[in-house]
Design a protein with these regions (language model features):
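Charged, amphipathic alpha-helical segments and their flanking helix caps
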Residues: 1-43, 56-172
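A short glycine-rich, His/Asp/Glu-containing loop-to-beta-strand
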Residues: 49-53
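A short, polar/charged loop/turn motif at coil->beta-strand junctions and beta-hairpin connectors
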Residues: 45-47
Length: 172
């Protein structure tokens, strides 16, 4: 069973964020992560290791008719940084963190989806779009820089427009 637009657009971000936070526990894949930023702008101090998530615009993957079920694509970008004294070590550590983020998504998305949607299936597939050592950001108060590695994962999910219209017509 698919979900309607009211649920689908709200839950996609919750599910993907949940995949990361589920592993930011003792003995988790991301236990060492100090900061998880899930907004576009962070005003506070960012401690590393850091994972920064950005949800990009959702587009129709195929079939743009809004009178039926749509397959949508929502790209999520994860930018990961780890400080090490040696820049080569920091680069390797940032790439390792990025790899563990991918693993966290793959490990948890089905379980979290089942919990959030009470057994309904919304996410159909998650694919790697691109993996990129993006560059460096300066460290406040130091001449050092932290290498950042990024990955974009495309999350394909279904929305049932008809179900939404039926619920509105029925007053649900």
């Amino acid at each position: 069973m698919t979900v309607n637009i009211l649920t689908g657009f709200e839950k996609i971000n919750t599910i993907i964020n949940g995949c990361i936070t589920a592993e930011m526990v003792e003995n988790g894949i991301l236990a060492d992560v100090e900061t998880f930023v899930n907004t576009y702008y962070e005003e506070g101090q960012v401690e590393e290791p850091v994972v920064w998530i950005t949800q990009h615009p959702t587009t129709v993957s195929k079939g743009a008719d809004i009178s039926k079920t749509l397959l949508l694509k929502t790209p999520f970008e994860f930018d990961c940084g780890v400080y090490e004294v040696e820049i080569e070590d920091a680069n390797t550590s940032s790439q390792n963190l990025c790899n563990r983020v991918i693993l966290s998504i793959l490990k948890n998305w089905q379980t979290i989806q089942n919990t959030e949607l009470e057994g309904k299936r919304m996410i159909r597939n998650i694919e790697l779009d691109r993996y990129m050592p993006m560059g460096y950001v300066p460290v406040t108060g130091k001449s050092d820089k932290v290498p950042i590695t990024g990955v974009i994962l495309n999350v394909y999910h279904m929305i049932n427009w008809q179900q939404c219209c039926q619920q509105i017509n029925n007053g649900d």
